[in-house]
Design a protein with these regions (language model features):
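A short, charged, Gly/Pro-tolerant segment at domain boundaries
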Residues: 218, 236-254
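Residue-level detector of flexible, active-site-proximal loop/helix-junction positions
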Residues: 74-76, 104-106, 175-178, 191, ...
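Electropositive phosphate-/nucleotide-binding environments in soluble metabolic enzymes
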Residues: 11, 15, 48, 127, ...
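Catalytic subdomain that performs nucleotidyl-dependent activation
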Residues: 66, 152-232
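ATP-dependent adenylation/nucleotidyltransferase module used to activate substrates
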Residues: 2-156, 164, 194-202, 252
Length: 254
């Protein structure tokens, strides 16, 4: 009986996730016929779900598109993903996986002025991963890169930019690169993190072996706590912030 209930809940969640995924595709015109999409597969729950949604959708008649995945190892950051698990996950979805390794230097500023200018490890890690992805995508003829940022990520980014940069914007659902023939899409942009967590638990998505040592050492972790407090004050805050982002056209950058 317990297994039956879990299957029912998993099916219900999948329907909800897929419905919001399809709505995001239509709302922000994320995917077109003949697209070749490279998915950034970190090994976390968000990227695993993103790949599953796209891989299943690729078998639907319209739009017809091709999906492959890429995992970038960061040699000098001590966290670990089970690459064999990612290979099996991709194989089950009939998706080709590309694995690359890169690294970056973390500076040691000697004064406060240099420290303010110093890029965070999170920024450097993300930027260097994307450089590898951009290079591979262009070399293999992909025209779109799909990243696994969900609605909570976009809302947190908006609050970070408002708090620390004095501007109200976020990571767009669709971003056309100016210096290369690539478009970044975020198909999970209308999906809540709590639904992803619940589905990942039911599906038994494997967690990373070791978490990133910088995971809690950033403004983003502070903003997450702030946002949790905001939701305690107003449980509808998510929808208010999302409406504001849409009203100001912050989710499309062409």
């Amino acid at each position: 009986m317990e297994k039956l209930n879990q299957d029912k809940e998993s099916h219900r969640l999948w329907h909800r996730l897929n419905e919001r995924f399809v709505k995001a595709m239509a709302t922000y015109h994320l995917i077109d016929d003949d697209d070749r999409i490279l998915v950034g597969l970190s090994g976390g729950k968000d990227s695993l779900l993103l790949l599953e949604l796209l891989a299943r959708r690729a078998h639907v008649q319209h739009p017809r598109f091709k999906v492959e995945a890429m995992h970038v190892r960061m040699a000098n950051i001590h966290y670990e993903t089970d690459t064999s698990y990612l290979e099996q996950f991709c194989s089950n979805l009939d998706v080709q996986l590309h694995v690359r390794t890169t690294s970056f230097e973390i500076g040691n500023p000697t004064n406060k002025r240099d420290a303010r200018r110093q890029k965070t490890p999170c920024f450097l890690c993300s930027w260097n991963r994307r450089k590898v992805m951009f290079n591979l995508a262009q070399a293999l003829g992909f025209n779109k890169i799909a990243l696994g940022h969900h609605q909570d990520d976009l809302i947190h980014t908006a609050l970070m930019n408002l708090t620390f940069q004095g501007r109200f914007d976020t990571m767009p659902a669709l971003l056309k690169m100016r210096k290369m023939p690539l478009t970044i899409i975020r198909p999970l942009c209308m999906i809540e993190e709590q639904d992803i967590k619940a589905y990942a638990e039911l599906q038994g998505y494997q967690k990373q072996k070791k978490l990133c040592p910088y995971e809690t050492d950033s403004h983003r972790s502070d903003i997450k706590r702030l946002y949790d407090a905001i939701e305690q004050i107003n449980p509808e805050a998510r929808y208010s912030i999302w409406r504001a982002l849409n009203a100001d056209n912050k989710l499309l950058e062409e």
